[in-house]
């Protein structure tokens, strides 16, 4: 994050670690941002998690509910928090980090795929609805990324810096130019 902030130069950032599924904490975070900066130009929705791989018939429904809350509802909550300020200014950008699993659905990934597919639907509808307010939406579909998201490191996956660079490019181009970015490591062969 520090490196990205330095690369972007004359920009103002505020970061805070909190439970994104807690609506009061989301609201408090946004209130702090409004007080500090007056508005929000870009929101990157990147919170998410995955559960163990299960067949659809074996999915723990409580785990699935939590996954929907984290991977979908929380991002929508953040959008709802900042949208009014963007709409008032007729300017802004939402960058929603989805997953390449939205482009195909593999066995044993039902919980994760369902929640990311739901967020993709919200994001595509938002793209159409936000157009009237001159607000852009960019959906990022990363494949495997070598982070602690997975239990085991895989140097053949995308580097986090690669994904961050694409997000940065999306933010820097003219408003409304980039709608979807698909990033896949060479190792993945489940292309739709």
Name each model feature, range by range.
Residues 79, 115:
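Active-site helix of classical SDR
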Residues 139-140, 154-191:
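C-terminal helical subdomain
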Residues 99:
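Residue(s) in the substrate-gating loop at a strand-loop-helix junction
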Residues 104, 125-135:
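Active-site-adjacent segment of SDR/Rossmann-fold oxidoreductases
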Residues 54-56, 63-65:
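Substrate-binding pocket helix/loop in short-chain dehydrogenase/reductase
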Residues 17-28, 61:
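The beta1-alpha1 cofactor-binding region of Rossmann-like NAD(H)/NADP(H)-dependent oxidoreductases
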Residues 59, 105-113, 125, 153-154:
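Active-site loop-to-helix junction immediately N-terminal to the catalytic Tyr of the SDR YXXXK motif
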């Amino acid at each position: 994050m520090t490196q990205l902030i330095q690369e972007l130069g004359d920009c103002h950032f505020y970061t805070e670690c909190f439970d994104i599924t807690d609506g009061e904490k989301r609201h408090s975070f946004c209130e702090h941002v409004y007080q500090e900066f007056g508005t929000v130009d870009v929101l990157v929705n990147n919170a998410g998690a995955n559960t163990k791989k299960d067949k659809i018939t074996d999915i723990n429904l409580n785990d699935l509910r939590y996954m929907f809350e984290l991977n979908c509802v929380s991002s929508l909550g953040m959008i709802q928090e900042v949208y009014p300020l963007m709409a008032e200014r007729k300017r802004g950008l939402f960058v929603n980090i989805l997953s390449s699993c939205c482009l195909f659905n593999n066995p044993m990934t039902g919980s994760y795929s369902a929640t990311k597919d739901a967020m993709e639907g919200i994001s595509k509808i938002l793209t159409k609805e936000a157009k009237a307010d001159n607000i852009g939406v960019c959906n990022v579909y990363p494949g495997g990324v070598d982070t602690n998201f997975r239990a085991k490191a895989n140097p053949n996956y995308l580097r986090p810096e690669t994904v961050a660079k694409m997000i940065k490019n999306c933010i820097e181009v003219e408003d409304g130019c980039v709608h979807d970015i698909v990033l896949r490591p060479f190792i993945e062969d489940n292309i739709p």
